[in-house]
C-alpha cells in the first residue's frame, strides 16, 4: 500500500489501482482527489473538509463514496456522492479497503467553541488516522498518522501519544500551520522519539510517498 502526504492534514492511500483519500481540507492540494474512489472525513472543520472540491470530485466520478460522521454529512447536502454516516465501532469495506471507525469527539479546543464529533479511521489494520484527537486505537497500530501541531494540543501530548500507541512507524499530520522554524522543531521531536522507541518517526513533506509493508 502506498501512502502519500498532501498539505496539512490530508493523506492518500493507493492499493491495487484503488484510491482512498482522508481529510482533503482547504489547506491541502485538490489534486489529492484525482482518481479517488472513496473519501474518509474525520470532522467538519474547514482544514479537513471542503465541500466545493468534494462536489467537483463527485462530478468527475459519480460513484464517489464519502464516509464520515453525521455532523459532516449534514454539511455535504449539495455534494452528489454516496455519503455514508459512520460511528465509533463501525467497520466497512470501500474501494477494496477495510476500515474500522475509532473515536467520537474532537479534542477540546477554545473554551467558547463547541466540541464537534470526530471519528478516526483504521485502514486495512495498518494505518490509523485519529483526526483531531489523541484517541487510543485499542489495537496494535503499525502506521500512525500523528497530529504534530494544533490549537487543541501541546507538543508533549504528541510525545505521550506516540509512547502510548507505540507504532512501528509514525508520520506527521496536521502540520500546515507551521513555518520552517516550527517544522524544524517537529522534526527534532519526532527524531528524538524515533531514537527512543527504535521506530521510524518522521515528517513527510507534501507530495512525499512511502510504501508500507
Q: Residues of each region from the PLM?
A:
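Active-site metal-binding motif and surrounding structural segment of the metallo-beta-lactamase
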Residues: 26-68, 142-145
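Binuclear metal-ion centers of metallo-dependent hydrolases, dominated by the metallo-beta-lactamase
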Residues: 1-4, 77-95, 159, 169-213
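Short, Asp-centered acidic motifs that coordinate Mg2+ and/or phosphate
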Residues: 19-20, 38, 143, 169
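Core dinuclear metal-dependent hydrolase active-site scaffold
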Residues: 1-34, 85-140, 151-157, 205-213
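A short helix->loop->beta-strand "cap" motif at the edges of active sites that frequently abuts
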Residues: 60-65, 165-169, 197-199
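Alpha-helix capping/helix-boundary segments
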Residues: 46, 72-73, 90, 135, ...
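Metallo-beta-lactamase
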Residues: 119-192
Amino acid at each position: 500500500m502506498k501512502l502519500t502526504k498532501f498539505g496539512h492534514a490530508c493523506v492518500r492511500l493507493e492499493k491495487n489501482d484503488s484510491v482512498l483519500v482522508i481529510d482533503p481540507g482547504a489547506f491541502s492540494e485538490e489534486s489529492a482527489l484525482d482518481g479517488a474512489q472513496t473519501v474518509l472525513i474525520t470532522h467538519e472543520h474547514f482544514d479537513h473538509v471542503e465541500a466545493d472540491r468534494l462536489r467537483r470530485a463527485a462530478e468527475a466520478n459519480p460513484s464517489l463514496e464519502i464516509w464520515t460522521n453525521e455532523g459532516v454529512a449534514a454539511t455535504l447536502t449539495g455534494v452528489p456522492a454516496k455519503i455514508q454516516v459512520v460511528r465509533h465501532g463501525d467497520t466497512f469495506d470501500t474501494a477494496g479497503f477495510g476500515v474500522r471507525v475509532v473515536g467520537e469527539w474532537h479534542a477540546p479546543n477554545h473554551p467558547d467553541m463547541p466540541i464537534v464529533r470526530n471519528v478516526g479511521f483504521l485502514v486495512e489494520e495498518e494505518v490509523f488516522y485519529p483526526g483531531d484527537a489523541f484517541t487510543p486505537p485499542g489495537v496494535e497500530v503499525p502506521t500512525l498518522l500523528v497530529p504534530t501541531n494544533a490549537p487543541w494540543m501541546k507538543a508533549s501530548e504528541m510525545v505521550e501519544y506516540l509512547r502510548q500507541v507505540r507504532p512501528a512507524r509514525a508520520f506527521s499530520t496536521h502540520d500546515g500551520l507551521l513555518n520552517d522554524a516550527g517544522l524544524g522543531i517537529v522534526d527534532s521531536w519526532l527524531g528524538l522519539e524515533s531514537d527512543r522507541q527504535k521506530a521510524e518517526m518522521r515528517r513527510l513533506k507534501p507530495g512525499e510517498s512511502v510504501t508500507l509493508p
